[in-house]
Amino acid sequence: MRISRKAAATTAIAGLLLALTACSSSDSGATALDPNADLSKQTLTVSNWAAYNPDDLPAKFEEKFGTKVTITNHATNEEIMAKLTAGGDSGIDVAFVSGQFAQALSAQGLIEDLDKTLISNEANLYPEAAKLAYDPGNKYSMPYSWGTTGICYRADLMKGNEPTSWNDLLMPKPQYKGKVTMLATERWLMLPAQKALGFSANTQDEAEMGKVKDLLVKAKSNLLAYDDTTFYERLVTGEAVMVEAWDGWCNYGIAKNKNIKFVVPKEGSDLFTDVMVVLKTSKNKEAAHAFINYILDKDVQSWVVDNILYKVPNIPAMEKSLPALVGDFPNMGITPAELLKNESLVDLGKASALYTRIATEVTAK
């Protein structure tokens, strides 16, 4: 199911990115491409999260361009990163990854700088989409969807005590203790404490992260669970009254219970992005660029909004889909400017090991 995209993420990124940093980097310049290439003579293998694109996407792309497309699935960023960094040709032409992972791939010379002359639909993107810290100007990646993390809660069960701060989640009022969940994936496990303490979501400072750990350990006794997969269901049933949640996932709960609401805490949050990249080893780079350009079409991107309930940084797609959704799912109306007030997640490099160690120590039984 499509929502397994984030749920399956694990703390394996730490060791992986540490290994990546130790590898030697190759030239990351773009390969010269032929704008008149016969795309019917090229084939594409694309790796994406399951159910994260329309089922008929390969057939429609082949009908338009003559290029046969095979879409394979990965469950996590870590899974596809392991495949792409194993050495040799992975056989993948285009991969969908989160922004900070694209940054790591680019640093190791494993993905192409994009030829923007072949991606005219970049013009559909909001200007804010070119201002993200992991890839300013979208030099080597093109955004597919974006969002933020906040508190998803049952307004009917918290009347008069609606959360406004990360501290409301970490140190809830006595009547809500044991009815709160936090995300287990390490970057998002750290986020509430980082923001509550006034730190960056990308901090690599050991002293700051020590304070983050102390706050998370203190908060642990207030939790029902660390939960990446069923937190919105817990809200629906009333088992939980307040959970840390990705905005799109909160929408899955809202779809089942209109008493569920979403708020970005006053201390701020993150801005996460899923992107498309072209592998250096691809022998079908013109078709790969055509595929990315096709994905940025209004109708393809509006499918993401309508079916995944995530925002996309695509102006005509949001203009097409938002009016019918924003009434039921108010967080879909968070503007690009509002999103950009939050921190874009970046690759932590060697500091990933620090995050992994703290996550392990905090969540250990």
State the predicted function of each range.
Residues 101-104, 242-259:
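A ligand-binding cleft/hinge motif common to bilobed small-molecule-binding domains
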Residues 209-218, 254-282:
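Periplasmic-binding protein-like
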Residues 1-11:
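Bacterial N-terminal signal peptides that target proteins for export
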Residues 47-54, 91-92, 96-239:
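Extracytoplasmic ligand-binding site segments that recognize negatively charged/polar headgroups
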Residues 335-365:
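Conserved C-terminal helix/tail region of periplasmic/extracytoplasmic solute-binding proteins
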Residues 19-22:
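C-terminal motif of bacterial Sec signal peptides marking the signal peptidase cleavage site
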